[in-house]
C-alpha cells in the first residue's frame, strides 16, 4: 500500500468515526465513546493535512490549465506560472509532513507521566540540581497548561532533593517529556566553594507513562502492603492514626512509600499509581533491551544511566549530547522554556524513523 492509499484509508476511517460518534448507542456507552473520540483526535491532524494536500494538487491542475488557456496573454501566463511554482513547492512540503504524520505513533504519547528526579553523583550539589530540574519541569508544565503534582519528596539538609516523584497530567505529556530520561550533568561553582572552582554533579531523570489499572493488572498476591505512622522532621510520629503506606512488588522488589496525604486511602492510591508505572516500566525495559536494534534507532542508546545533557553555568550553555545540540541559553531553559530542546529532539526522532522506513 503506497502513502496515498494509506492516507485515503485514514480519511475514510475518520469520516466513519464522525458518524459513529453521533450514534446514540455509542454516545450512551461511555467507554466506547471515549475510545472512538481518542482515535478520531489522533487522526485529525493527518486528515486535515491530507485534505489540504489534495487542494494543493488541484491548484497544480488549475494552474497548468490556466497556462494552456492563456491565449498569448503574457501577464496571465506569468501569473499562472508563479502559481504553479508555489503549488509545487507546497506539494513537496505537504508530502514530507504527511510522511511524518503517518509514522507509527508511540501508544504512550498521549499519556500522563510519572516523573522521578534523583540527586546522583555530587552529594548536596547534586540534590540542589535535582531541585533546579524539578523547577524547570514545573514551569514548563505550567506553560503547556499541564497539571503538576509532587507526590513524594525526600529532601536533604540544604534544600535540595535526594528524590522527588511528580505526576504530570495533560495533553500529550509523554510525547514531549519522554526524551528527558537519563543522566543530567551540571557544571557550576557550588555556593560552599570558597576557591571558585567549578564542580561537576549529576542528577538522574526517569519519565514513565502513567499506567491505568485496566491496562496493567498487578496480582494482589504479588504485593505486600505495610501501614505505619507518618514521620515528620527528626523522625517523630506526626499522626496518631497510621496513614503512611509502603507497597512492595515481591517479584521485582520494587518499593514505594507514601505519606504525603492525610489519609491512608489517598496514600495507598498514590502509591499504587507509582508502583504500577514502575513495574510496567521495569518489564517494558526488559522487553526493549531484547530489541536493542530498535532501541538504537531512536534517540541515544536508551540506557537509563546514559549522560544525555550537560548544563554549564559559567558558559550559560546547555548541550544535548544525543543530537549534538548546543544552546547558550541555560538561564532561559532552566526557567522552563524547553520548547527549543524538545522540538529538536522530536524532529531528530522523526528523521531517524523516516530513514529507517526508507531503508
Curated annotation (Swiss-Prot):
Q: Provide any one GO MF term from the record.
A: translation release factor activity, codon specific
Quote the SUPFAM superfamilies the UniProt record gives.
Release factor (SSF75620)
- InterPro entries given in the database record: PCRF, Pep_chain_release_fac_I, Pep_chain_release_fac_I_sf, Prokaryotic/Mito_RF, RF-1
Q: Which SMART domains does the entry mention?
A: PCRF (SM00937)
- Tell me the keywords, alphabetical order: Cytoplasm, Methylation, Protein biosynthesis
Tell me if Cytoplasm is a UniProt keyword of this record: yes
Q: Which residues form a coiled coil?
A: none
Q: How is it modified after translation?
A: Methylated by PrmC. Methylation increases the termination efficiency of RF1.
Sites of N5-methylglutamine modification: 236
Q: Does the keyword Signal apply?
A: no
Q: Which family does this protein fall into?
A: Belongs to the prokaryotic/mitochondrial release factor family.
What HAMAP family does this protein's entry cite?
Rel_fac_1
Q: What is this protein called?
A: Peptide chain release factor 1
Q: Which organism is it from?
A: Streptococcus pneumoniae serotype 4 (strain ATCC BAA-334 / TIGR4)
Amino acid at each position: 500500500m503506497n502513502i496515498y492509499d494509506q492516507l485515503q484509508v485514514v480519511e475514510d476511517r475518520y469520516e466513519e468515526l464522525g458518524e459513529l460518534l453521533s450514534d446514540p448507542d455509542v454516545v450512551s456507552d461511555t467507554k466506547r465513546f471515549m475510545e472512538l473520540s481518542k482515535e478520531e483526535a489522533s487522526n485529525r491532524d493527518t486528515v486535515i493535512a491530507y485534505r489540504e494536500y489534495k487542494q494543493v494538487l488541484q491548484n497544480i491542475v488549475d494552474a497548468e490549465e490556466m497556462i494552456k488557456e492563456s491565449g498569448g496573454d503574457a501577464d496571465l501566463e506569468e501569473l499562472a506560472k508563479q502559481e504553479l511554482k508555489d503549488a509545487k513547492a507546497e506539494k513537496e512540503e505537504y508530502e514530507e509532513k504527511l510522511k511524518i504524520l503517518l509514522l507509527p505513533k508511540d501508544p504512550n504519547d498521549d499519556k500522563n507521566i510519572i516523573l522521578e528526579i534523583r540527586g546522583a553523583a555530587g552529594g548536596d550539589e547534586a540534590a540542589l540540581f535535582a531541585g533546579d530540574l524539578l523547577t524547570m519541569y514545573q514551569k514548563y508544565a505550567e506553560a503547556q497548561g499541564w497539571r503538576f503534582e509532587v507526590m513524594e519528596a525526600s529532601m536533604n539538609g540544604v534544600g535540595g532533593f535526594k528524590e522527588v516523584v511528580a505526576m504530570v497530567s495533560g495533553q500529550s505529556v509523554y510525547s514531549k517529556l519522554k526524551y528527558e530520561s537519563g543522566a543530567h550533568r551540571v557544571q557550576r561553582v557550588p555556593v560552599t566553594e570558597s576557591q571558585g572552582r567549578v564542580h561537576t554533579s549529576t542528577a538522574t531523570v526517569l519519565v514513565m507513562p502513567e499506567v491505568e489499572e485496566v491496562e496493567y493488572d498487578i496480582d494482589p498476591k504479588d504485593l505486600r502492603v505495610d501501614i505505619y505512622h507518618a514521620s515528620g522532621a527528626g523522625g517523630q510520629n506526626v499522626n496518631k492514626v497510621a496513614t503512611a503506606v509502603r507497597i512492595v512488588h515481591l517479584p521485582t522488589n520494587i518499593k514505594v512509600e507514601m505519606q504525603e496525604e492525610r489519609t491512608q486511602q489517598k496514600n495507598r492510591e498514590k502509591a499504587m499509581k507509582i508502583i504500577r508505572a514502575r513495574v510496567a516500566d521495569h518489564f517494558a525495559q526488559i522487553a526493549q533491551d531484547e530489541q536493542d536494534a530498535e532501541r538504537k534507532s531512536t534517540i541515544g542508546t536508551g540506557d537509563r544511566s546514559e549522560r544525555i545533557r550537560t548544563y554549564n553555568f559559567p558558559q550559560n550553555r546547555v548541550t544535548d549530547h544525543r543530537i549534538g545540540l548546543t544552546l547558550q541559553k541555560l538561564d532561559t531553559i532552566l526557567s522552563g522554556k524547553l520548547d527549543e530542546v524538545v522540538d529538536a529532539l522530536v524532529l531528530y526522532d522523526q528523521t531517524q524513523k523516516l530513514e529507517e522506513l526508507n531503508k
